[in-house]
Design a protein with these regions (language model features):
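A positional/structural detector of protein chain ends, strongest at the extreme C-terminus
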Residues: 1-4, 282-284
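Beta-sheet entry/capping signal
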Residues: 6-9, 45-47, 78, 219
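Cleaved targeting-peptide boundary
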Residues: 21-32
């Protein structure tokens, strides 16, 4: 059992690790933060910043249950944030480093509007805060041993900052890789676009459905002092594919091209179907 610290702030006792809660004031808000007292098995090597493609995430959500619907971001053809994941090389996790430090919506209130736009809970019918709560409890509480992440506000703010700096929408578009329901792309071209822009090896994840590779997520990695670095060595469902002499970290089937789908809402599809039916009726 970790050491007990009797302090004016808060008494905390955790297995294998001890923390002290303190507070800091920023922009008029009282933010809870975490000060590390000891280190433990929850240590990690890298931070993985994961961006997801909303159209594919929506497709996967609907696949689980045909009654599911999606809450898409305002810009449906823009990459959104999934999370920032502390990771130990060759292992999964750490995760859930402090189950007593629950997600508190008040801590991210100043940036909530921004989060709703780019760190979107696509799963309609679930709580607005369910994704943020999950990411904070599972990953944020582990990242919090670093000063740059030792509060909810800092953790989620860093996600916003990294998205602005490393937007996959901008990186891919600058290489003429854009969402399309008719054109597909080679995985090596997607990897090359990211690698040439950032100078590091990303992880590219696909979801396979109906015999097609759908791009799902792109992950980039950072050292604990927040310097971008290669993702080599992370343990995910990743295959080190060698394509034309290039090593690519991906689970995408290299024998086929990748679909980067443009999102088409169900309501728009129904409207189009009705319009086409009406036009056919006019020509009778």
């Amino acid at each position: 059992m970790g050491t007990l610290f009797l302090l004016p702030s808060v008494l905390i006792s955790l297995t294998c690790i001890s923390y002290i809660y303190t507070a800091e004031i920023a922009n008029g808000y009282d933010f809870k933060i975490l000060r590390r007292v000891t280190t433990n098995r929850h240590d990690f090597d890298l931070l993985i910043f994961t961006q997801q493609w909303p159209a594919t995430a929506c497709k996967e959500w609907k696949k689980k249950d045909h009654s599911h619907s999606c809450s898409m971001p305002p810009k449906v053809d823009s990459w959104s944030i999934h999370g920032i994941w502390p990771t130990k090389l060759g292992e999964m996790g750490p995760s859930f480093c402090n189950r007593t430090w629950l997600f508190d919506p008040e801590q991210i209130r100043p940036i909530e509007d921004q989060l709703e736009s780019v760190w979107v809970n696509i799963f309609a019918g679930t709580s607005l805060y369910s994704l943020w709560s999950h990411e904070w409890t599972k990953h944020g509480t582990c990242a919090a041993v670093l000063d740059k992440f030792n509060s909810e506000f800092k953790y989620f703010s860093m996600g916003l900052e990294w998205l602005q700096q490393y937007s996959m929408s901008n990186i891919l578009q600058s290489n003429n890789i854009v969402p399309s329901n008719t054109q597909q792309y080679a995985i090596e071209d997607i990897n090359k676009a990211v690698k040439e822009k950032l100078g590091v090896d990303p992880v590219i994840e696909c979801k396979k459905e109906d015999g097609e590779n759908y791009i799902s997520e792109i992950r980039i990695c950072f050292t604990k002092d927040l310097k971008i670095t290669n993702c080599d060595g992370v343990l995910f469902p990743v295959v080190y594919s060698n394509i034309d002499g290039e090593s690519i970290l991906t689970n995408c089937d290299k024998s086929m091209k990748v679909t980067y789908p443009h999102y088409v809402s169900t309501s728009w599809t129904v409207h189009l179907h009705s319009l086409l039916s009406w036009l056919r009726w006019l020509t009778l």
